[in-house]
Amino acid sequence: MITTVSKVFLFSLLIAISLCVSADDFTVGEITVPRGEQVSGFITVPEGMDEGSTIPVTIVHGASDGPVLALIAGIHGYEYPPITALQAMRTQVDPAALSGTIILVHIANMPAFLGRTIYYSPGDGKNLNRMFPGDPDGSITQRIAHILTTEIIDQANY
């Protein structure tokens, strides 16, 4: 049974958390971006039956409300033109002039990129393009697909 003190503590904790993360912030994985700013970082793909990984992303959260656009490069590790295009785009978007949010996934399949493989991840031999929506308990490629689906695609309008 929850006591009155416990209820007050839980309510206070809920209020404190909601004040720390403003309604105007945008969060992807471990990355939270205030309105009108741009932040780059990594989304963690946890270890499972094999190694974990990270997914480098940049989030440009516009000064005004609007739709969310997700651009994902590097589904296959050898797709260099989209990877470099998103890196260039990152420097060309002004969050103060943007309505909405852009999520740039620079390299979706880091194991394949580092392994310099064309279609398949060297860790499990799977093609990320065929793994969506993914499996949180599957192989590294299945977990990457799951993270991309739940953290990126599900938040995007386009």
Residue map of PLM features:
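A detector of low-complexity, intrinsically disordered, Ser/Thr/Gly/Pro/Ala-rich segments
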Residues: M1-I2, L13
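Structured catalytic-domain cores with a bias toward divalent-metal coordination
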Residues: I2-K7, V21-Y158
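Sec-dependent N-terminal signal peptides
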Residues: K7-L13
